[in-house]
């Protein structure tokens, strides 16, 4: 951990120097900041990175900038939910597939808002705003798709469940449950599955990124260094303890974590 009072250049050291230098050395790629003319912070020597296969920045940047992005799509759990609905007898009878329940492709989505559930309204002197789509009333889908129900709930009602509720609602879905459990473990069990990414705070977005990394870390090959900037922002003491245990789940297999606080 890199600790220090506010203004002591913790973020500069961890992000602008360490992360960007490792990114350049390991992948040979340059961050967007470098493309915009900002250089890697000055340092004398960088050693010990030879055994690393990747460096991952887990920051507080939004997971998406439109209502189309949400927690369940970000952690790649929506594929499982769509598969479950496509297997419902009524869906099979109507020849619906998993893509029918996607709001990112044509089929079952509302075409007026293109599955976003919201319409963007351009404002001249202020930031653009999003208002619920009048065609689908914010549901994202065409009415016939909502006829398909799994244990009494349609796809919209499932997306309105919190992570905690969804874990109880899908007790036999191991793959889906594992992804949702990781979100719960980072203290985000209160988030709704389909909650627009635009409503998430920076701290929530960062912890969601941690949850996704935890979900896929067991499948990944090689050693990673995770760089995090103040992940305990606005967390209560008990939540910090939980987060520390969760980060241990990343370190235990073969990865390392560097964080600033």
Give the positions of each predicted feature.
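Conserved phosphate-binding elements of NTP-dependent enzyme cores
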Residues: 1-261
């Amino acid at each position: 951990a890199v600790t220090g009072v506010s203004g002591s250049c913790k973020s500069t050291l961890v992000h602008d120097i360490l992360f960007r230098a490792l990114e350049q050395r390991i992948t040979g790629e340059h961050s967007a900041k470098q493309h915009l003319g900002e250089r890697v912070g000055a340092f004398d020597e960088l050693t010990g990175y030879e055994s690393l296969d990747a460096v991952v920045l887990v920051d507080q940047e939004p997971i998406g900038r439109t209502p189309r992005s949400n927690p369940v799509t970000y952690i790649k759990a929506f594929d499982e939910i769509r598969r479950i609905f496509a297997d419902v007898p009524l869906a099979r009878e109507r020849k619906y597939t998993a893509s029918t329940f996607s709001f990112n492709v044509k089929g079952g989505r509302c075409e007026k808002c293109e599955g976003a559930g919201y319409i963007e309204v351009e404002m001249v002197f202020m930031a653009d705003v999003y208002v619920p789509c009048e065609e689908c009333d914010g549901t994202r889908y065409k009415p016939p798709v909502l006829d398909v129900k799994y244990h009494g709930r349609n796809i919209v009602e499932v997306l309105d469940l919190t992570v905690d509720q969804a874990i109880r609602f899908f007790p036999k879905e191991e793959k889906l449950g594992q992804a949702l459990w990781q979100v719960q473990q980072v203290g985000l069990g209160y988030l709704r599955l389909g909650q627009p990414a635009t409503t998430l705070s920076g701290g929530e977005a960062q912890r969601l990124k941690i949850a996704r990394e935890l979900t896929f870390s067991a499948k990944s090959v090689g050693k990673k260094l995770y760089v995090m900037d103040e992940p305990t922002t606005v967390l209560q003491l008990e939540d910090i303890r939980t987060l520390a245990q969760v980060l241990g789940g990343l370190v235990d297999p073969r990865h390392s974590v560097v964080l600033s606080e």
